[in-house]
From Swiss-Prot:
Coiled coil: none annotated. SMART domains: TPR. The keyword Repeat applies. Keywords: Phosphoprotein, Repeat, TPR repeat. It comes from the Eukaryota. InterPro entries: FKBP4/5/8-like, TPR-like_helical_dom_sf, TPR_rpt. Residues 1-49, 94-115 are annotated as: Disordered. The gene is Ttc9. Transmembrane segments: none annotated. Belongs to the TTC9 family. Pfam families: TPR_1. This is Tetratricopeptide repeat protein 9A. TPR repeats lie at residues 56-89, 125-160, 161-194. GO terms for biological process: bone development.
Length: 219
């Protein structure tokens, strides 16, 4: 708004030059300076991967502390900030498939060492798992979003117990009992004695049994 005000004030007729003065030179157009805090995209472009990873790890740690303090909304914000720092460091599977082998540009991921790539993926997995955990603490749970985050984890780490279990819970509450049972049974193969998994499997099987009974009655 300040720039607009300046433009409005400078658009009026300038005062005539004093007697004996020549024509006044026309001032150059105002060009925004490069000062001030850079936007996230600019910072992300300029920062080295090691610095982005360090900041992401710091935000993730802050999110974990907020979760312990039961400040779930703040924790969600911290985990999102962590993921934002890592955005673009690891290409998605679609990007990897679409990128030609002789690409002229050097992607950010090529600047990562093997250890850095593993660290980035581990942080992403932790953040998505933690986001799902935070959402499940809400009074009104967004199970669609819980499912989304858990499936992101499973794309990277298909045997992740927490993501399997929470996927099953999300699908159960979304009414997709077949998928719920699949993910819950997958979770049970990782931790056969987990009481929460066993309880949700029982609940899901009861729902499926009722659905089957209704279908028979309808016939």
């Amino acid at each position: 708004m300040e720039r607009k005000g300046l433009a409005a004030r400078s658009s009026g007729n300038p005062s005539p030059p004093a007697l004996g003065e020549g024509p006044r030179p026309v001032p150059p157009p105002c060009v925004p300076s490069g000062g001030g805090a850079p936007e996230r995209g600019q910072a992300g472009t300029a920062a080295e991967p090691a610095e982005l990873i360090r900041r992401a790890h710091e935000f993730k740690s802050q999110g974990a502390q907020c979760y312990k303090d039961k400040k779930f909304r703040e924790a969600i914000g911290k985990y999102h900030r962590a993921l934002l720092e890592l955005k673009g460091l690891l290409p998605s599977q679609e990007e990897r498939d679409a990128r030609p082998a002789s690409s002229a540009g050097v992607p950010k991921s090529s600047r990562l060492s093997e250890e850095q790539s593993k660290t980035v993926e581990a942080i992403e997995i932790d953040c998505y798992n933690s986001l799902a955990a935070c959402l499940l603490q809400a009074e009104l749970v967004n199970y669609e979003r819980v499912k989304e985050y858990c499936l992101k984890v499973l794309k990277k780490e298909g045997e992740n117990f927490k993501a399997l279990y929470r996927s099953g819970v999300a699908f159960y509450h979304l009414g997709d009992y077949d998928k719920a049972l699949y993910y819950l049974k997958e979770a049970r193969t990782r931790q056969p004695t987990d009481t929460n998994v066993i309880r949700y499997i029982q609940l899901t099987e009861m729902k499926l049994s009722r659905c089957s009974q209704r279908e028979k009655e309808a016939m």
